[in-house]
Amino acid sequence: MQTASSLSVLTPLNEENVDRKSSWSKDTIAVQAVGSSPSSSSSHDFESKEDAEGMNKDESAPSPSTSSPSSASSRSQSKYVRKEALPPQLFHHLDSAKDKALTTFEEIQECQYASANIGKPPENEAMICDCRPHWVDGVNVACGHGSNCINRMTSIECTDEDNVCGPSCQNQRFQRHEFAKVDVFLTEKKGFGLRADANLPKDTFVYEYIGEVIPEQKFRKRMRQYDSEGIKHFYFMMLQKGEYIDATKRGSLARFCNHSCRPNCYVDKWMVGDKLRMGIFCKRDIIRGEELTFDYNVDRYGAQAQPCYCGEPCCVGYIGGKTQTEAQSKLPENVREALGIEDEEDSWENITARRQRRKKGIDETSKIIEEVQPTPLTSESATKVIGVLLQTKDDLLTRKLMERIFLTSDPSVCRSIIALRGYNIFGLMLKKFSIDIEFILRSIKTMLSWPRLTRNKIQDSNIEPVVQEFCDHENEEVKDHAKTLLKEWESLEIAYRIPRRKPGQVAPQSTNAEPSNNQSNPPLRDQEPQRGDKGDIKSAINNSTEDLSKKHPALHSSRPSDSRSRSKFGNDYQSHSKHNLFRKNSFPKRRRLSNSDTPSETTTPNNEQEQVSNQANKVDLNKIISAAMESVNQKNVLKAQKEEEERIAQQKREEKRRLAYEESLKRHAKKLHEKKTKSSQDATIDHHLTSHSPESIAFKAVLAKFFANKTARYQEKLGKAEFKLRVKKMTEIILKKHIQLVLSKKEKALPDELSDSQQRKLRVWAFRYLDTVVSRSGTATTTPTDSPSIGESPKKAA
């Protein structure tokens, strides 16, 4: 977020403007400023624009008695009273105002960058996490919440091109626009607001703050432009030093998130690919219907303060302080956590100290960082520190965070730092502070004290060439420690990791595999079911028996009712042949004669009836067993088909992941090669481009010829010797200017010839130069030496 130190150089554009918020401004402030405006005319001016700002006229601002400076001052004086936090207020009963809010700006899906180089982090190398693809129901759940993904813990999003965690992992919320369910509603005093449309757990990604990313020069220009257009309220958020997100005319719903002195959300900066992006996250569990708010960290510019209507017990009464000198700047949430600063909200001593600093005009942000007493890291704070070190460009903050790492001696915490790319961080810091002997010495000593078992992390970070440069350092202590560190690293071995199964590799199939789809099925009567399908056969037989009993009750009524024969059919089933299956059930059992039976009672049916009954039983049972075998066979075939389809689909998924992985490795290798090639070319230019280089001599001849021809009329006024001296002097000035542009990467190389625009500018400058020489009698001590900038007009050059 915006801090006072980052914009303290700005001057108020117009003291009559009601309010200016350099980091944040909302159309809701138009209503807030009505009660405290200096005159009634300004109040009417605001009210006439309520419809344009999305406000209803019947929802007017509070009366002066409720929002006057005196009442606001009383709120400010009572802010030090410790009060209990109020329960969250819910607004889900209010109607949605999203459609109306969308008419006040142009909604865009991605940030729009003013140039290709803007929005890039300090270190633009791809960070690869250690996670591996883990697929559940077709979804890659790698790098999810609680997965200890290094990228996720250090506010870096994974990308499919540069990581081995697989495509579409869970750490791609910015890229996939996985925003929370939110809605826009109309507040009582603050204009539009943003509310949760569902219960949101802590640390949920709410929304990305989207807009136009512009440099500081364009930011200043837009401040003046919006002021001339009559736009009273701007939407600027600082992305990093010298770069801002402007959501005034183009943005997302995140622009409607209001300020609160006790917010339920916070803003965090994430590295997504080669760009930095700002997101709003839940600071605590949020209930559906709650308004989503965060601390604006405002540095105000203007004559009047903006009253705060958050309604919290700790409310300071104003956004940005009562006066311009009291504009309170705060550190971003992630920076405070990285520095180990505890909440100062209710501390009287800290409030008094801040007041004194503001009265003396001291840069409060820098002073806070300087006054922080570094403490050793814990495993939890290590992730915060590494995340900020990868994003910040502030040298003071970097040194303070590195001091915390230097003080850390706990082996478990040191191992956590190493796992969180500690060697990468130290490599960057050694390059950044390469002339600070004390910093270099402490860095090398810290790495010497780290526990190390293998060489893997050291090799992956490419820190050895960086330390190797200090082996020839002029300081003997630095040289000795660097050699000792390299010697210890060389004695370590690279740990061998058991390789995972390669993408596309399929486990060997067993000999009992199910038949594939293209295999022809043998005839039903020759195919025997597997032993594992015995239960399926019994079930199919029972079902078929029940169906036939319903269709042919006469056939089944003549079947013997001996329960023992039916139970033997199921329990004694061993063979799958029809003969063995019906051997015991072909004929009904005859009842054994007893002594008391008479011949008439034991008389058997005639042979014809018995033969018909037996034949019907055979037909019936043949149908049952045929239906059962067919049912089992169909199940086996379907099962085999399903397994074969799943196996083919798995092969395709693995092949796709393998190709994506190989492609990402190729792209990563290509980027590294291009970076090395570019750095070597730049180094060649830096070391060989001087005023005596062949290209410099050639360009010098072009300049000398140009100045001699275009300024020949001054030869009579100055004399031949003096004229030649001045031509030589002008040539050297312009040559030196171009060499500086090439060395600073603003120009690729010295031009072979001068363009028409360059000739015009140089001719005007040369005439002014020689006129000045003539007017000053051509003395060497009074000769002008200012050189023109090729991109400037002749007036500016003069």
Curated annotation (Swiss-Prot):
The UniProt entry, under Gene3D superfamilies, shows:
SET domain
SMART domains hit by this protein: AWS, PostSET, SET
Bias (Low complexity) ranges = 61-78
**One biological process GO term for this chain?**
transcription elongation-coupled chromatin remodeling
Keywords of the record? Chromosome, Coiled coil, Methyltransferase, Nucleus, Phosphoprotein, Repressor, S-adenosyl-L-methionine, Transcription, Transcription regulation, Transferase
Q: Where in the cell is it found?
A: Nucleus; Chromosome
Return one GO MF term: histone H3K36 trimethyltransferase activity
Q: Name one Pfam family in it.
A: AWS
Tell me the SUPFAM superfamilies matching this sequence.
Conserved domain common to transcription factors TFIIS, elongin A, CRSP70 (SSF47676), SET domain (SSF82199)
Alphabetical list of InterPro entries matching this protein: AWS_dom (IPR006560), Post-SET_dom (IPR003616), Set2_fungi (IPR025788), SET2_Histone-Lys_MeTrsfase (IPR050777), SET_dom (IPR001214), SET_dom_sf (IPR046341), SETD2/Set2_SET (IPR044437), SRI (IPR013257)
Biased segments, Basic and acidic residues type: 44-60, 525-537
Q: Where is the composition biased (Basic residues)?
A: 576-593, 667-678
The answer, when asked if RNA-binding is one of the entry's keywords, is: no
- Stretches of Polar residues bias are at 1-11, 507-522, 595-615, 777-790
- What protein does this entry describe? Histone-lysine N-methyltransferase, H3 lysine-36 specific
* Phylogenetic lineage: Eukaryota, Fungi, Dikarya, Ascomycota, Taphrinomycotina
